[in-house]
């Protein structure tokens, strides 16, 4: 079965945006229609849509959808409302930089419009372009990543950096889909990824849909699995990469990087250029989202911890650059000296700017 059997995470429908409800997977495949800016915000904030690229795509469509309904012919008023709504959507989640990148790209695209109608058309076209480009970007990331693995290799991953977290293919999971297309055998060991279980619910599900060999383990089995199963490499996605290569990704990623160092196996980060934030100099500058305690104290709505227990629930951690063997982007594989090599990937126009 090809990756194209995996449902798309986001679709533009002219009058609304349709998303795959990732909170209901794997037991229920449910689509939700988002009709308002508030619908889009809520879908992002509550993880109905998740994965840095998919968040960016959804936010871009949400901003374009809102702008289509502005009842003004004044460009100044149009831009004021656009900036207001951009800021509102940007507040949905603080860590994933693709959210801000996509929203700012739309605002910039509409800046030179000579009329409100032209601005509205430009916003829709730019949002669609972001999704189309992301599919190509993910495939190129996958091709580069695939070159790093030997046929038959066993590779570990955490969270879900797959097809449903992007336009298609994913980032960290892209090489496994391409390997399947090319008849190359690779095996994936997927961590369940507490507390929201993206690995168990999403990664295991979508890899199985595509016929990729996947084994699910709990997070605290990682070290034993590396030793007992001969894991040859670890590959993860990213929500934000600082200029020096420090990488924010799902909580537990830092621990995996430490394990990779201990076992002397490579630790790879797979991400598009849009996830690299040159305005963030080091990982210390990356805001770490903390989420509701119920994610830790409940599973599938059932309480598993005592009432009133203290909970610490950071959604992400930051892996220091010295633990990262290479960062895999659509432009190639970058190894070390990230302060110099990451900026060199960008043209001036591609660099992140805060709008």
Swiss-Prot record:
Pathway, per UniProt?
Amino-acid biosynthesis; L-methionine biosynthesis via salvage pathway; L-methionine from S-methyl-5-thio-alpha-D-ribose 1-phosphate: step 1/6
| Keywords tagged on the record | Amino-acid biosynthesis, Isomerase, Methionine biosynthesis
Pfam families, A to Z: IF-2B
Q: Which catalytic reaction applies to this protein?
A: 5-(methylsulfanyl)-alpha-D-ribose 1-phosphate = 5-(methylsulfanyl)-D-ribulose 1-phosphate
Q: Which GO terms describe its molecular function?
A: S-methyl-5-thioribose-1-phosphate isomerase activity
Q: Where does substrate bind?
A: 50-52, 93, 198, 249-250
Active site per UniProt: 239 (proton donor)
Give EC number(s), comma-separated.
5.3.1.23
Q: Which GO terms describe its biological process?
A: L-methionine salvage from methylthioadenosine
The keyword Transport belongs to this UniProt entry's keyword annotation: no
Site description Transition state stabilizer, residues in chain: 159
Family assignment? Belongs to the eIF-2B alpha/beta/delta subunits family. MtnA subfamily.
Query: What is this protein's function per UniProt?
Result: Catalyzes the interconversion of methylthioribose-1-phosphate (MTR-1-P) into methylthioribulose-1-phosphate (MTRu-1-P).
Q: Which PANTHER family match?
A: METHYLTHIORIBOSE-1-PHOSPHATE ISOMERASE
Quaternary structure (record): Homodimer.
Q: What is this protein called?
A: Methylthioribose-1-phosphate isomerase
Species: Geobacillus kaustophilus (strain HTA426)
